[in-house]
């Protein structure tokens, strides 16, 4: 039941479903010695709520209790990557490969290698997967990861081809949102609304629609922007952590408020250090006329290391 509510929360962007997922665990929510299956679900719920420290603690307990649990290592790698612990993420991915030679482990390692500028990583994973029968859900995820790898490496034609297939294949809206970002970055806002027309109206989807409609001077933009403003408004004047990335980008690209965007992007960087977060902080610092505010990104590029042609162009 908890997993079902969490899946709905991810798919529909409905906060109530995440709360129901937590409630479904009952007393297990606060017990450190929960069964491994419960620890995995609890970690996923915490990850969804951006409690990455709590999620990793649960996953550490899970792999301590069952060191051969592939899903625990995969989830651990994903959160470590999100929080910028790239070396630890690679170690977790290697555990997956050692345990099962799982495709996801190889994709994870290739993704991390591409972040270090390994131009051959994309081709290696493509060769490994060529001709293999993979389920639709896994295929959509893998194609999206490959597309993001290609984009970071500056291989835009390959990225677009992969994004297009991923958007048609993957469940949920993540692939379509990622493709929408690609289109927006290449001045193709006119293609975004059709791409997202049937996507669940999550905050991420609405943000891309707002950007596209605004850039194409579509009269529907005002209503979408108003809905986003309502959703992202912090309760009682308090800014939480769940929507920091979306709030920062909304402030920067929709509202044109670079100072607020920089504050939000800086706070977001303290939690999440994915390429999208680095790009956001660098862009906000540049727009606000405060290049020194992008220093944490420059440091991250040096150690643990992050190669992204978009980021290097932005920081020049």
Features from the language model and the residues they span:
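Register position in tetratricopeptide repeats
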Residues: 7, 48, 82-83, 115-116, ...
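Short coil turns that delineate tetratricopeptide repeat
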Residues: 33, 67, 100-101, 134-137, ...
């Amino acid at each position: 039941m908890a997993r079902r509510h969490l899946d709905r929360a991810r798919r529909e962007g409905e906060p109530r479903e995440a709360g129901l997922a937590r409630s479904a665990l009952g007393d297990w929510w606060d017990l450190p010695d929960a069964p491994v299956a419960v620890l995995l679900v609890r970690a996923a719920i915490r990850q969804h709520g951006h409690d990455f420290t709590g999620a990793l603690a649960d996953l550490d307990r899970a792999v301590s209790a069952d060191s051969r649990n592939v899903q625990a290592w995969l989830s651990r790698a994903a959160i470590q990557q999100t929080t910028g612990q790239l070396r630890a993420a690679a170690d977790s991915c290697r555990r997956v490969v050692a345990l099962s030679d799982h495709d996801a482990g190889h994709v994870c390692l290739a993704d991390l290698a591409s972040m270090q500028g390994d131009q051959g990583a994309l081709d290696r994973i493509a060769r490994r997967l060529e001709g293999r029968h993979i389920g639709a859900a896994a295929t959509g995820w893998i194609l999206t990861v490959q597309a993001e790898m290609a984009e970071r490496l500056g291989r835009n034609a390959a990225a677009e081809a992969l994004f297009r297939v991923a958007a048609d294949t993957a469940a949920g809206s993540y692939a379509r949102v990622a493709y929408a970002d690609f289109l927006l970055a290449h001045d193709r806002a006119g293609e975004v609304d059709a791409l997202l027309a049937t996507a669940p109206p999550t905050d991420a989807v609405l943000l891309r629609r707002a950007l596209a409609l605004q850039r194409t001077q579509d009269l529907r933009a005002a209503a979408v922007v108003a809905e986003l403003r309502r959703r992202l408004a912090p309760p009682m004047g308090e800014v939480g952590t769940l929507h920091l990335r979306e709030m920062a980008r909304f402030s920067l690209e929709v509202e044109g408020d670079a100072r607020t965007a920089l504050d939000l992007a800086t706070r977001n960087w303290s939690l999440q250090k994915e390429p999208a977060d680095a790009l956001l902080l660098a862009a906000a610092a540049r727009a606000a006329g405060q290049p020194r505010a992008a220093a944490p990104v420059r440091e991250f590029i040096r150690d643990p290391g992050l190669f992204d042609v978009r980021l290097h162009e932005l920081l020049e």
